[in-house]
Amino acid sequence: MKSQTFFLLFLVVFLLAITQSEAIFGAIAGLLKNIFGKRSLRDMDTMKYLYDPSLSAADLKTLQKLMENY
């Protein structure tokens, strides 16, 4: 009975370690993708790609002012 309990605890700890390392590797991969991705290497203006026919030029200018320091 002791060996089964020990084995169960070992498996639980092992599975926790695997899931944590997978999360860390995923976060590192996502960070590298964001740093070295195609879009991040270019200087892109996000407001340039905003398209909504209901927005006027004054609305876009106001949005740009609001998003300057964001």
Swiss-Prot record:
Entry's localization field: Secreted; Target cell membrane
Residues recorded with modification Phenylalanine amide: F36
GO cellular component: extracellular region; membrane; other organism cell membrane
Keyword Nucleotide-binding: no
Any one GO biological process: killing of cells of another organism
Superkingdom of this protein's organism: Eukaryota
Similarity section: Belongs to the non-disulfide-bridged peptide (NDBP) superfamily. Short antimicrobial peptide (group 4) family.
Keywords associated with the record: Amidation, Antibiotic, Antimicrobial, Cleavage on pair of basic residues, Cytolysis, Fungicide, Hemolysis, Membrane, Secreted, Signal, Target cell membrane, Target membrane, Toxin, Transmembrane
Function of the molecule: Amphipathic peptide that exhibits extensive cytolytic activities against both prokaryotic and eukaryotic cells. Is more potent against Gram-positive bacteria (lethal concentration (LC)=0.25-2.9 uM) than against Gram-negative bacteria (LC=6.2->50 uM), and fungi ((LC)=14.1->50 uM). Shows hemolytic activity against rabbit erythrocytes (37.7% of inhibition at 6.25 uM) and cytolysis against rat dorsal root ganglions. In vivo, intravenous injection into mice tail provokes uncomfortable symptoms with a death rate of 12.5%.
Coarse class of the protein's main subcellular location: secreted
Protein name from the UniProt record: Venom antimicrobial peptide-6
Residues making up the propeptide: 40-70
UniProt note on tissues of expression: Expressed by the venom gland.
GO molecular function: toxin activity
Upper classification of the organism: Eukaryota, Metazoa, Ecdysozoa, Arthropoda, Chelicerata
Signal peptide residue numbers: 1-23
